[in-house]
């Protein structure tokens, strides 16, 4: 018997939607604008709870910490979460030993997980190739928040500093069970010399390997790594011809920055045994060694034993979990909102089953009477699904419906990992996290949808959820080369220039169309057309020039507006200086977290 709350799919959206009075903070409003028409108090409360600026986030977290210190048990970790944190230590320790990033700060943070009053701040992402800035900015945001809260707590309680102000841990969860398709194997750099205005660094995968989990994907071959280096050095050389940064000092600055970064790449490559670890180790090298952060890294695929009790809870309460997701998806669809969450998510179990081929399967939950040693065992819970890659039929018995005793077996647990929405549910329930930073893309939508499930399952959401959607504005070698191509000096001039070209193209079209009609009329009537052909030729030639400029300017726009990978920051700022500028923006500004960050490269230019 298939277990599910309902066989009815989410309702289709109507043609129109309404808008209510949901008003999240001004700077963040655009991020959540499509949710404004959702008349749901849970969603409204969640969105309005997200701080607009960093100082507000610090004050709110300080309030949480002070109240926690003043009370005894309510906010402290209970026995379950403390036991789970102890389990977590083993897997964190394993990662940092293998990555060679077991610094003193990391070691001290691991030890803090033994203290029930320790608060955990969490950020999450896949181990992308040369991860883009947004991934690192999550870590910087939480580290800066941690530092500021600890500093203010120290000022308030000098006499109890060791008891109260140094008990925050930053945890970065590596979602290493994602497939090898899409962004996880792609890194971008701005380059108008390429067709789309960007250079793509890409891990080649075959059809047979694109459905592998990143954790099971072998490390790239030396040939691939060398090719990435060759692509980057070629990009550096071609972009260094710009008049704005072709001086010997700039070329030396760029080259030195790149070589320092590539040393970290080579070190991570030498330690890694999988594609996921190569990218994860590089992130940890940057964060823990170069930046000196005490952020803890851990692999999602290894920590299922930490979530054992949570898996049991979600599976035992699957009808509530499923119904919450179904209702949430139906509600958003009625308002014309596509959250990116699969419409069939509510039908699937909250876990993936891992396949021997290295891929995984979405599974459904079945209840079945089974006999064992001629003694009937009532109501066994079975997970069943088909591997996305090899199409094998996977089955796992979790044991008696009321006890799910096989979830206590680590061999069973290591064959599963949580799906997207359950990840945050489990982090909150089983580890008692206090703060979570979301991305601005799919993770934010998943969190909004998940807020409904939190309520239905009586799980407390993080006390504070943050988003840092700001864009970095700077004039690096790729951006300057792009602007120089269209003889512009400011990135803000690109869109007005593009619109002016489109307007000219439309004007030419307006002049050409009647001439074409007149030419056709004259041909039909046998009248001379030489003059019209001459005029048409001149106009079309001018229009072709405009359209060539439009094509070039579109590449320029892509180059200056894209979110490049960490290589662009390493080259233009140096890895260490990158986080300094991000932190400075947070600490020096009371502007919205959505406000752009004006960053200064080390290049000697007119900018």
Regions inferred by a protein language model and the residue ranges of each:
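N-terminal targeting/trafficking signals and adjacent low-complexity tails
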Residues: 2-607
